[in-house]
């Protein structure tokens, strides 16, 4: 299965310079957060496959006005063609606001869905905005990863 993963930056290749059919090769599109509503709606309109997303730390507006044609999978396991995808958006808390979590809060989110994880017999893909701690995270607390993701992936 060919999956397109997008996050943070709107790729001009798929938007400003779009040519009809450019998204036809993908069977699934995963959006990892911090993408504008209009961009997600454009992708969903042009693609002939599901567009699943989680929110990033700059996506407060998507809580009240979600992008049409897309499926938010926050705290859910979405199954597509036998592939189980868990969505856990947000970043490490660095200020007050929505879609930001401490390590403890993210652990609690995982704990709240532990029955679902057991019932579905695990997951195949973890869709997040933040990385796991130490895996492609960056300096600065806003780009820090979550250690609890390792527990989840075991």
Where are each of the predicted segments found?
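Conserved catalytic scaffold of divalent metal-dependent phosphoesterases
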Residues: 5-14, 55-148
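A short beta-strand/loop micro-motif in the catalytic core of glycosyltransferases
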Residues: 30, 52-54
